Amino acid sequence: MKRLLLAHRLLASALLTLALLLLWHGNAAALDPGCEEGEHLDGAGYLICMPNTWNGELLIYVYGYVSPTAPVEIPPEQLQPGGSAISINQFATDQGYAFAASDYGSNGLSVQTALVHIEDLVTTFTALKGAPSRVLLLGVSEGGLTAALALEQRPDLYAGGLALCGSYGDFAAQTDYMGDVRVLFDYYFPDVIPGSPVAIPQTLVDTWETGFYTDTVRPVITAPENAATVEELLTVAGVAHDAGDTDAQVAALETLLWYNVIGTNDASAKLGGQPFDNQGRVYSGSADDAALNAAVARFTADTAARATIAADYTSSGKLAVPFVTMHTRRDPTVPYAQATIYGEKVAAKSSQLLVDIASREVPFPFPAVSQTVQCVAGQEANVR
């Protein structure tokens, strides 16, 4: 037992070192990663990169949310987030790790397919390169939830992991958070966006990124006379923001509306119904809470959707291997509360295998890709 505890502590230390390297890694020239592409499970594409000198360990990258309308592939922009000078696969091989990633066979809400594909990726890697001494996971955004579930469910396969800004605490709460933003937008700015928060017209999905947002929504939320209303909307929705920073507020609202418009129908189809529920929600922080709560639209989640979330998208906090989470305290897309909730789950299991790193309070304006950039600025580590 003492040896097992020591091994876990050593691995936790290694993961923390990897996290700190992510924090401070500069733009130095990378070693040639020796990458190769191929196909594995059901024709899914993989990327495998080997370092010049392999330390024997494999780092699997579990990327974040991708639009359901995008091509199914390992998203290049998530391998090199924010146009950084070094890619994640180069970073991994610089540290001596073998690197591997796979597409998930689908986009949008892909947690369950991701779990299957990364597991098969280990088999594929082993057949091509030999068995790794340890397999570690690096999950970003939606991939952070996938990594948490994978570590909880397959500690025999994965030795530990690192997750950045994921909804690993309470996926149902994350779903409601996204829905609240759209419900409140429709209250404050009625008849701007067609459809409802739980039923998105396909024409809106098709045109959101090619003109509708830019031509119809953005002029409304950037109008100087609406600045106070936008800030109140974010306050009521519980979106982290800095008072008076209108550019960041608009960017946060743009991102959250993007997820609602682009992702809602896909999520409902995969969950077996629409998952958003605000029947019992009491909104506060507005100029007139009574009027807001009386008039805001109310929705009841489909029972099947919530049951699917509970069964397939909800972490337990039961860890048998070390896990490091990194999360921005001011994250407007996936609130820092997700890290807090997950920490409470782990603590309830009397585990000491979680390290939580809270990053600088720097809000960011973009979806999952930029979460990587912001999360790697983390500073404060708290071990539970």
Give the residues covered by each predicted segment.
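N-terminal cap/lid segment of alpha/beta-hydrolase-fold proteins
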Residues: 31-54, 291-299
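Alpha/beta-hydrolase active-site loop
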Residues: 108-129
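Primarily recognizes the serine-hydrolase "nucleophile elbow" in alpha/beta-hydrolase
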Residues: 133-189
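Conserved alpha/beta-hydrolase "acid-adjacent" motif
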Residues: 333-338
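Accessory cap/linker subdomain of secreted extracellular hydrolases
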Residues: 167-316
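Short beta-strand element of the alpha/beta-hydrolase
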Residues: 56-66
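Histidine-bearing beta->alpha loop at or near hydrolase active sites
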Residues: 354-378
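Short beta-strand/loop motif that positions the catalytic acidic residue
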Residues: 325-327
